[in-house]
Regions:
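RNA-interacting cores
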Residues: 1-371
């Protein structure tokens, strides 16, 4: 049963401290709607935008870096965890019910900002159409550094739980299986970007392919929304990974394998981890992961179907950037079909309103010609 929050005043600043040399930390926010709220399925875009607005209001230099589309993102954001139900074409958050939201930092620079941020948090997270009171915040993943992870005790076997749908990019497509090479490539990218201890990617991943075994797995898949545009097929569940006997021939890679497993709860797995995908924890669990609201699944399936139609059409006509444009057309049209205004869609996608208006007209025309 969901836990109903006791009414109490918002307490700020929150008495959270951690060492200044910290590079990795995770925070858990308790958010409480004061009334029943209704959101469109892609609400994680709003969480992402609110977080970046918080950064931008106090540190313009860090904000510019976080908006850089070329670099690995030194933070992750979860979706809301709690009682979320479908209500027509929207999802509903219930009044006075606690929802959990997780934010992690993957670099010293970001955690420095977070340390100052939690001392002066706003009382309300202003999610579109759903003001959420920030009731409390606590440390979810303890402060540490990359060096401390690397020097920690070797774990030859560990399990990973994938709490939110997780997917990888492979040859231009989504790949919804936790193959060790894909899993550790995901972690190594963050490690090489933020640890200051870069490792040869090809050599390590070849070692992973040869010596890392999946000893147990329990997985399921679902179609989900993926950030600002498109939909993906992602997996949830758990896997157990072990070093094979011959892995000891390269002990430094064995130690890195162990460290990257401990990094997983901080950095998440796969892509779109700043939009709620890939939430990962250590340990095994056979429990069913929280259901994705039906309306989110319906929208994700509609976006995927439209994307395939538009991709096929644009390739026939020789259009450039076919995949990207097809995904945008599909996302805009599907969200409009669900009742969202084009103005809201334009704001979420950070596109000019007139461009979005043109795209939805072109998408409808293309769809009609296919009928």
């Amino acid at each position: 049963m969901p836990r109903r929050s006791q009414k109490k005043p918002n307490i700020a600043p929150y008495k959270l401290t951690w060492p200044p040399e910290t590079e990795l930390i995770g925070l858990e926010f308790e958010l409480v709607p004061t009334k029943d709220c209704y959101l469109f399925p892609q609400y994680t875009i709003g969480l992402h935008a609110w977080f970046l607005q918080q950064v931008g209001s106090t540190d313009s230099e860090l904000s510019a870096y976080l908006h850089d589309g070329e670099s690995e993102k030194p933070f992750t954001l979860s979706a809301l965890n709690g009682e979320i139900i479908s209500s027509g074409r929207q999802i509903q958050l219930s009044a006075n019910i606690s929802y959990r939201w997780y934010v992690t930092a993957l670099s010293n620079r970001v955690q420095q900002w977070m340390a100052q941020w939690v001392e002066n948090l706003p009382e309300v997270l202003e999610l579109k159409n759903a003001p959420l009171q920030i009731r409390s915040v606590k440390i979810a993943h303890p402060p540490t550094t990359y060096k401390q992870l690397l020097e920690s005790d070797l774990s030859e076997t560990f399990a990973l739980k994938f709490l939110s749908p997780t997917s990888f990019r492979r040859k231009g497509h989504h790949f919804p299986l936790p193959v060790p090479v894909n899993v550790f490539h995901s972690y190594l990218r963050r490690w090489n970007d933020f640890s200051g201890m870069s490792v040869d990617q090809d050599a390590f991943l070849a070692w992973v392919d040869d010596y890392i075994l999946i000893t147990r797995c329990q997985l399921t898949t679902a179609k989900v929304l993926a950030g600002k545009k498109g939909a993906v097929t992602g997996f949830t569940g758990a896997i157990e990974l072990s070093l094979s006997r011959d892995a000891a021939k390269q002990p430094e890679f064995g130690q890195l394998f162990s460290a990257l497993g401990k990094l997983a709860p901080y950095c998440g797995t796969g892509h779109k981890t700043t939009f709620g995908l890939g939430q990962t924890r250590l340990g095994w669990s056979s429990q069913v992961v929280q259901d994705i609201p039906d309306v989110q699944t319906v929208l994700a399936k509609r976006i995927e179907d439209l994307t395939q139609i538009f991709k096929a059409r644009r390739k026939r006509t020789g259009g450039d950037r076919a995949d990207e444009i097809a995904s945008k057309w599909a996302t805009i049209l599907a969200r409009r079909e669900m009742g969202e205004s084009l103005q809201v869609v334009a704001e979420d996608l950070e596109m000019p309103y007139e461009t979005v208006k043109t795209y939805v007209k072109l998408a409808r025309r293309a769809l009609k010609s296919e009928e």
